[in-house]
Curated annotation (Swiss-Prot):
Source organism per UniProt: Staphylococcus carnosus (strain TM300)
UniProt similarity note: Belongs to the CTP synthase family.
Protein name: CTP synthase
Annotated binding of ATP, by residue: S14, L15, G16, K17, G18, I19, D71, R240, D241, A242
Gene Ontology BP annotations: 'de novo' CTP biosynthetic process; pyrimidine nucleobase biosynthetic process
Gene Ontology terms for molecular function: ATP binding; CTP synthase activity; glutaminase activity; identical protein binding; metal ion binding
Reactions it catalyzes: UTP + L-glutamine + ATP + H2O = CTP + L-glutamate + ADP + phosphate + 2 H(+); L-glutamine + H2O = L-glutamate + NH4(+); UTP + NH4(+) + ATP = CTP + ADP + phosphate + 2 H(+)
Enzyme class, UniProt record, top EC level: ligase
Length: 539
């Protein structure tokens, strides 16, 4: 039977519940267990797809096209699995589904209430995560902080699930903060005690407590937490601040967290903990030699979580070269043709990531022009590909005023236009072209050199696409369309052979990058940036 582990958090937000859950998933997977993981978010949006990146950070897209919380990116990268739409459940999605059922008459005229209707819907979503994957273990992170009013239905649902499935199939892990009071010169356990008391008041006794701390815990502190929170001392796990997120699984393993979980749930682990691959990765991360500077030109750079998967993918690509990636954050609203060199003269590569809306788009186009004209390695993702074709149309083809129809509906040259199937859609939420789609790669191109095969699959998130009316004209002037959809209708990749590395794609390759397996385009881009840097230094 599938076992269920619930990870809750107390005291403050941003404790690292997601990293804790992902790290535990990695440990259990390395013991030969199949693991899936999900996030319950208590906000009332149906999904984060229409939320501002300033509010939420990046939107992570799964293979089956779900727009989800960025924590799912951590889950996939740590555990090296591909998640599905059941891996992110919001209060908005739950309430919306319950209300649709009520309108259909599914409740036979009964009064619809939080208990049992909302809690039952939450439990159904929880069980679907296990049923859709046949996993040995489902790890569920509960978003928010214990005691938050909006998360109470989720807490109640996971309390009930213990009775539904029996105690031996359910485990609760609670993450708390152990603050250091500088004036007193000591760490305080009281916030942890009160957080656990709050959780117990809601009917949940944690089996294991993960304590986030800046400094090493003494045995006395562990004993005190164990006493007041009514758990064995060995079930108090220290989680120290770390320079690299990839240290966390090893921290937890040293304290036998996986052994405690396996024993508590009577899991049939096939192997002892080795983590050799993870230890090798961490050894590489801790011994990087030199750095490569990438100019990331975007409009949400004041909140770096808006580009989290892109940055992680860049780092992954640096590891085989033993290079650290220094991301230079460049606000595209400040970039113009006249000052682009000031912003970009010191970078080894330029990346324009995905985005929406007209604001700050001209600065991205200026950065792309600088990269093309100065032979600086360029990599464009989604909007970064669309604007690369806009820049080419304006400055190579001479089509003054060329633009994307999304950004300038009145443009005389709509190089980028609305997807045909989007013409009659009015709603914004959940209506993009989303998820994993195949592409065909043209032989004899940089794209083929990168992937080494004729067919690939990557994740997409877009509403607009390249307008094929301009394809022949661009090809005649040197732009190569190296990747297309299987029907040949949609452009997926473009490149400029006369430059050392000028490459862009409509899809989001960052979502499939792994720390031990860099995504091929990112790997090629960082290799090109490294060569560019070495050439500059040897001049």
């Amino acid at each position: 039977m599938t076992k269920f582990i619930f990870v809750t958090g107390g005291v403050v937000s941003s404790l690292g519940k997601g990293i804790t859950a992902a790290s535990l998933g990695r440990l259990l997977k390395d013991r030969g267990l199949s693991v899936t993981i999900q996030k319950f978010d208590p906000y009332l949006n149906v999904d984060p797809g229409t939320m501002s990146p300033y509010q939420h950070g990046e939107v992570f897209v799964t293979d089956d096209g779900a727009e989800t919380d960025l924590d799912l990116g951590h889950y996939e990268r740590f555990i090296d699995i591909n998640l599905n739409k059941y891996s992110n459940v919001t209060a908005g999605k739950v309430y919306s589904h319950v209300l649709k059922k009520e309108r259909r008459g599914d409740y036979l005229g009964g009064t619809v209430q939080v208990i049992p209707h909302i809690t039952n819907e939450i439990k159904e979503r929880l069980l679907l995560a296990g049923e859709s994957t046949n996993a040995d273990v489902v790890i569920t992170e509960i978003g928010g902080t214990t005691g938050d009013i909006e998360s109470l239905p989720f807490i109640e649902a996971i309390r009930q699930i213990r009775s539904d499935l029996s105690r031996e199939n359910v485990m609760y892990i609670h993450c708390t903060l152990l603050p250091f009071i500088k004036a007193a010169g000591e760490m305080k356990t009281k916030p942890t005690q009160h957080s656990v008391k709050e959780l117990r008041g809601l009917g949940i006794q944690p089996d294991l407590i993960v304590v986030r701390t800046e400094y090493e815990m003494t045995q006395d502190l562990k004993d005190k937490i164990a006493l007041f929170c009514d758990i064995p001392e060995q079930n108090v796990i220290e989680c120290r601040d770390a320079e690299s997120l990839y240290e966390i699984p090893l921290q937890l393993s040293k304290q036998h967290m996986d052994d405690l979980v396996i024993k508590r749930l009577d899991l049939n682990a096939k192997y002892d903990t080795q983590l050799d691959e993870w230890k090798h990765l961490l050894d590489v991360v801790n011994h990087l030699d030199g750095e490569i500077t990438i100019g990331l030109v975007g409009k949400y750079v004041s909140l770096q979580d808006a580009y989290l998967s892109v940055v992680e993918a860049l780092k992954h690509a640096g590891y085989p070269l033993h290079k650290d990636i220094n991301v230079k954050w460049i606000d595209s609203s400040e970039v113009t043709d006249e000052n682009a060199a000031e912003f970009l003269k010191d970078v080894d590569g330029i990346l324009v990531p995905g985005g929406f809306g007209y604001r700050a788009s001209e600065g991205k186009i200026s950065a792309i022009r600088y990269a093309r004209e100065n032979n600086v390695p360029y990599f464009g993702i989604c909007l970064g590909m669309q604007l690369a074709t806009v820049e080419f149309a304006r400055n190579v083809l001479g089509l003054e005023g060329a633009h994307s129809a999304e950004l300038d509906p009145e443009t005389p040259y709509p190089v980028i236009d609305l997807l045909p199937e989007q013409k009659d859609i009015e709603d914004l939420g959940g209506t993009l072209r989303l998820g994993l789609y195949p592409s065909e790669v043209k032989e004899g191109t940089l794209a083929y050199d990168i992937y080494g095969k004729k067919e690939i699959e990557e994740r997409h998130r877009h509403r607009y696409e390249f307008n094929n009316d301009y394809r022949e004209q661009m090809e005649d002037n040197g732009l190569v369309f190296s990747g297309v959809s299987p029907d040949g209708r949609r452009i997926e990749m473009v490149e400029l052979p006369k430059n050392d590395f000028f490459f862009a794609c409509q899809f989001h390759p960052e979502f499939l990058s792994r720390p031990n397996r860099p995504q091929p385009i990112f790997k090629a881009f960082i290799e090109a940036a490294n060569k560019y840097k070495e050439a500059k230094e040897n001049k």
